[in-house]
């Protein structure tokens, strides 16, 4: 009986520790739910908190850029998408999507030459 109690305590402690190591993932999922509901300001907040938990999270940064774009905060969305597009650890497809969205933010700001170059970069990575 005592052995079973120790196993139970160990299992609970291990699962609790694992859950605490992934707060960024949980925040990104919550942000995604808010984004789907078109609560863009709330999703921006959640993605920013996720980046606070893990500043290297590509998904949090990329999704933050999309939420900022949908909130019509194009200048901040542009900066965020630039970071996502520059992340050389990601696949060409992911970076191509980031460059495409970067082009969209630049287009909305009437930065047409920069937008064109971002679209070209997207096509170079994923023709």
Predicted feature locations:
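Hydrophobic/aromatic packing residues within the alpha-helices of TPR/SEL1-like helical repeat arrays
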Residues: 40, 47, 81-82, 119
């Amino acid at each position: 009986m005592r052995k079973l109690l120790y196993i139970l305590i160990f299992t609970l402690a291990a699962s609790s520790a694992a859950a605490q190591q992934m707060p960024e993932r949980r925040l990104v999922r919550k942000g995604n739910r808010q984004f789907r509901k078109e609560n863009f300001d709330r999703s921006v907040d959640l993605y920013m908190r996720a980046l606070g938990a893990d500043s290297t999270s590509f998904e949090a940064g990329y999704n933050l850029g999309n939420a900022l774009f949908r909130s019509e905060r194009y200048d901040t969305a542009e900066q965020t998408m630039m970071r996502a597009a520059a992340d050389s650890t990601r696949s060409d497809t992911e970076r191509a999507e980031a460059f495409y969205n970067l082009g969209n933010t630049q287009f909305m700001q009437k930065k047409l030459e920069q937008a064109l170059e971002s679209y070209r970069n997207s096509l170079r990575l994923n023709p």
